[in-house]
């Protein structure tokens, strides 16, 4: 049934390539456990015991953290919902499967770091990827959107674009820095997969010496694993969007306007993007308590 499910997803124009790959990886993980257990799974096999073993397999054997596991189980549940919608009899134990999400540390760049990136002397290839990242910083969009900005989206002093992920419209002010970079490439970009783009951006940020060591905690059930990593390793395509939102907040841009520019529909989601300004925190707290 999973093969049929994946084939239908392939034929659906509404399913992105990245999402399709996630369904395939879940299927492969199930097949791997099936092989390890030397058994054959049927729809009725996916009971409480199976999910306990499957989650343990992903945590222990595949070293998948709880936050990633939660997303994977979400994709797996889509398969079972599809089964029910199509009249296939399946075990309903999946409905009670729940993985606790853990707070995740995300990076956004400071004003001076954005300026540092903009001023770096780089070779032609890295110069292009740096500029594309800065387009994300100046526009506040996801990589899937800021990498496809086009003149046809211009409406007066704004770029109006519908997000690929959510279908929501963003009204992006065509500020001088953004327009300068878009014009530099004649609004025409050669795209690479976001994972490869992240590697390029991390290389650039390493050159920029964003070397501050940060402790990252990952949870695997009740097990916590802490690891020290340089800050540049935590920077990726989505850091651009977080940076736009965080710097807009620090510049006192009203939240409602930031939401219109980014296509974000809820204040809760917006707050999740906004990173702590530790310098501002210290300044205000020292003023209050010293």
Language-model features, listed with the residues they occupy:
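N-terminal core-binding DNA-recognition domain of tyrosine recombinases/integrases
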Residues: 5-18, 27-105, 119-120
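Residues within the helices of the helix-turn-helix
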Residues: 56, 67, 133, 144, ...
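Short, polar N-cap/turn motifs at the start of nucleic acid-interacting alpha helices
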Residues: 152-158, 234, 250-272
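Catalytic-site neighborhood detector that most strongly recognizes the C-terminal catalytic loop/helix
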Residues: 163-167, 262-287
